[in-house]
Structure formats: structure tokens, C-alpha cells
């Protein structure tokens, strides 16, 4: 038996179930998922507080990560428009559609 799975479950029972839930669930619903709610309820109050606090912190991390990814995507889009003309010019040169001038060849 693996640690943390409770007395009544085995790693074989939990593995596929957790994988299926993780593959289709949003971060918020995954945070609420509990394979053994009775196990959590049987924990001492101090430990339950830790578990719930950790879940709350993880949810805040998920919100921050979503914000980071939105901003990262925004920066990628901004630079894609800046890189666009340069990449197009490079494509034209490599496909012999454009011949650089003497000035463009100088360093």
C-alpha cells in the first residue's frame, strides 16, 4: 500500500481513477476531488486545517498560473507581429524570391 491513500485503497485502485480525473478536470474541480472524504474527515482538526489550507493555496497558485499564461500569450502575440516582417524577408531570401542589396549585405 502507498502512503497517503488510506487504509482501504491500493495504488492499483487509485492510479487509473486519478489519471482519468486529472485528464478531464479543471484545476478547481480537481482541487475539490477527494478519493476518500471519510479519511479526511477522520483526521485530527489540525491536520484537516493544513489540508484545506494547502488546497486553498494550490487554488491561488492555479489562478496565478492562469494569469501568467494569459500575459505570456499576450507578449508572444506582440512579438509575433514584430518578428513577422523579419521572418517574411528571411523566407524570401532563402527561397531566392528576394536578392539583398549591397547595403543590406554590409555589416
Curated annotation (Swiss-Prot):
A Gene Ontology biological process in which this protein takes part is: nucleosome assembly
Report the domain of life of the source organism.
Eukaryota
Q: Which SUPFAM superfamilies match?
A: NAP-like (SSF143113)
User: InterPro entries recorded for this chain?
Assistant: NAP-like_sf, NAP_family
Give the CC-aspect GO terms. Answer: nucleus
**Family assignment?**
Belongs to the nucleosome assembly protein (NAP) family.
The protein here is known as: Putative nucleosome assembly protein 1-like 6
Q: Which gene is this protein's source?
A: NAP1L6P
